């Protein structure tokens, strides 16, 4: 039998071929590690807002830029271990990864909490994601 850490990338890729996947916070980190990236500790940012910069397309189409977003975490994706199959699609002004997308499949991760009242335009992000189709 496969251990969970071995099965997770297989599960994410198989499901992500059929339906869009969105990992938020720990789910974002799970997607990042599933494809080979590393997670590191950082200073806790629980209930804090920061500006996030994005490319104003895909999930971020029509979203303010920078986006004021709520963060609740003490772990982050280690940027120099970004898997070759993933694109960084949003980050903080000091380069912390805030969103990723798989290059071939509709598999996304958000480090911040789009569902939080502390995230401006969070409803737009969720609407954009829910309207995505598998190509």
What spans do the regions from the language model cover?
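Cysteine-nucleophile active-site neighborhood
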Residues: 7-62, 68, 126
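Catalytic beta-strand/loop cores that center a nucleophilic Ser/Cys/Thr
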Residues: 56-104
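Acyltransferase
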Residues: 116-135
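Short histidine/acidic/glycine/proline-rich micro-motifs that form metal-
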Residues: 75-76, 115-117
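Active-site-proximal beta-strand elements of phosphoester/diester hydrolases
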Residues: 69, 108-112
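Positively charged, low-complexity/disordered segments
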Residues: 1-6
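Conserved hydrophobic/aromatic beta-strand scaffold that supports enzyme active sites
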Residues: 49-51, 97-99, 109
């Amino acid at each position: 039998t496969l251990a969970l850490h071995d099965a997770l990338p297989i599960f994410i890729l198989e499901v992500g071929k059929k339906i869009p996947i969105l990992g938020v916070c720990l789910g974002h980190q799970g997607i990042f590690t599933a494809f080979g990236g590393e997670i590191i500790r950082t200073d806790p940012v629980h209930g804090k807002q920061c500006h996030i910069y994005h490319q104003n397309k895909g999930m971020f189409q029509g979203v303010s830029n920078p986006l004021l977003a709520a963060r609740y975490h003490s772990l982050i994706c280690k940027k120099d271990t970004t898997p070759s199959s993933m694109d960084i699609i949003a980050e903080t002004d000091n380069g912390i990864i805030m969103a990723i997308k798989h290059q071939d499949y509709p598999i996304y991760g958000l480090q911040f909490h789009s569902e939080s009242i502390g995230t401006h335009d969070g409803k737009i992000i969720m609407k954009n994601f829910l309207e995505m189709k598998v190509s």
